């Protein structure tokens, strides 16, 4: 299904280590509104999305979120590569280091491990798409918060790219919701669950 290209979706070229920045950016790897949760959310939801166009949107965006997770991991890796024990202690990276050395491990900025409870796959297209719309806005806000904390242009450049993609994803999920609602009863979108209650094979 996937063709992997051996390059990042957007370049990440960071010349100076910064473990303090790494500790907050890692939240977009394994935090509640990060790229790992996003990719798992969309790639799980697509199986019970009754409309092919919307399934395609979920697949496209879920796949792109995997690429974004790779970018976040590259950023964190470059920010911590080659740190000395003295630097690790000085900048408060020691707690992470004890458990993971300098390996990538999904956690929030708070240190909370990634968990599948960060996302839902409900099997109702209206419910799932509203979750997706909210998820993209929460991710955008997180990137906004990161950009307020960091002023290194080498870090900010790929972060701004990722933030902009969240806006695009939000717009595409809005399109997916419109497609879904157009296929439902306009007087009551909630009259039935088109995934569970409609006859199998119906694309109406």
Identify the meaning behind each predicted range.
Residues 1-204:
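Non-heme di-metal
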């Amino acid at each position: 299904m996937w063709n992997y290209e051996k390059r990042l979706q957007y370049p990440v070229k960071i010349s100076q280590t910064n473990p303090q920045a790494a500790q907050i950016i890692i939240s977009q790897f394994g935090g509640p509104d990060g790229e790992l949760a996003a990719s798992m959310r969309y790639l799980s939801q697509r199986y019970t999305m009754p409309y092919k166009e919307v399934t395609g949107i979920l697949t496209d965006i879920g796949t792109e979120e995997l690429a974004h997770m790779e970018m976040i991991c590259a950023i964190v890796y470059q920010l911590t590569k080659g740190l000395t024990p003295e630097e690790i202690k000085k900048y408060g990276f020691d707690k992470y280091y004890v458990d993971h050395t300098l390996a990538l491990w999904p956690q929030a900025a708070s240190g909370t491990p990634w968990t599948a409870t960060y996302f839902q796959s409900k099997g109702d297209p209206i419910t799932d798409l509203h979750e997706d719309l909210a998820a993209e806005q929460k991710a955008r806000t997180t990137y906004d918060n990161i950009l307020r904390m960091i002023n290194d242009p080498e870090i900010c450049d790929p972060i701004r790219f990722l933030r902009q993609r969240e806006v695009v994803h939000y717009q595409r999920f809005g399109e997916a919701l419109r497609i879904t609602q157009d296929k439902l009863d306009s007087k009551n979108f909630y009259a039935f669950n088109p995934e569970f209650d409609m006859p199998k094979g119906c694309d109406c």
